[in-house]
């Protein structure tokens, strides 16, 4: 069917199992030939945007989800991409009791003995404590802790001294066990490759943890498309904080009017970008708030990166 569990050593001291789904027409057609079943959609988002139209191999667009493009849209020289819900589809289960039972055993091996419920409670409390610490240091910013500090403090609370690498390992084990799948949306690589070929500068601006996301970008094969990867944990603040946007604009010497923000959250991505004079593209994906939309240069009313590629890569003709 195209789904599979892929074993991959992407982090030290454990085997991560990441779900991969290769969304290609060839796989769908092969599946139809082998099973005799018709595929009605290859979209995981809120709306069916590509569907089988009766005749084998013929795919049509649903007009309800046609992209909206503002007239006279400027040509942009650089793009800031959100990750999860924009380029990457992900599902984690951090509330799973089996996760916390496993992590309690993991900590016990290092001499830090927790019950599963105690560990879960202390984890949440320490996340909040780290946010309060950062807020006290800079009251004007929206705080984003580094999760490895939390896992370090969980050891320290039980009187166990570990290295920062051991805290990072614990964080990555936590991520791998809670992860149900992480995969690219259909057309993500092609979009990045085409923009790169046109000489555009590509950046990540995402609310994410360095200890999780850098490895996931490499696993998915898109890390090297970006000129710079900015993750909120490295900046101790997160979107929609304008300081986070400005940090990347300033460090790269970018003119905001020549940069487009592409994301799936009107609140986190679009509002601040527009307030700074940037262009903006909103994508309503399966991870966007239900019923949300936006008023910006491009509105993708469903996840459809191939159509976005066509829009962006001929943008000079739209201006």
Ranges and model annotations:
Residues 17-18, 178-182, 207-208, 237:
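Short, flexible loop segments at the rims of nucleotide/cofactor-binding pockets, characterized by
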Residues 142-149, 176-203, 214:
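Short, acidic loop-to-helix structural element flanking the phosphoryl-transfer center
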Residues 66-122:
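Active-site neighborhood of HAD-like aspartate-dependent phosphohydrolases
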Residues 17-22, 91-98, 136-143:
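Short, flexible/disordered intra-domain loops and linkers
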Residues 63-79, 90-91, 114, 165, ...:
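Asp-based, Mg2+/Mn2+-dependent phosphohydrolase catalytic module
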Residues 104, 117-173:
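A metal-dependent, Asp-based hydrolase signature
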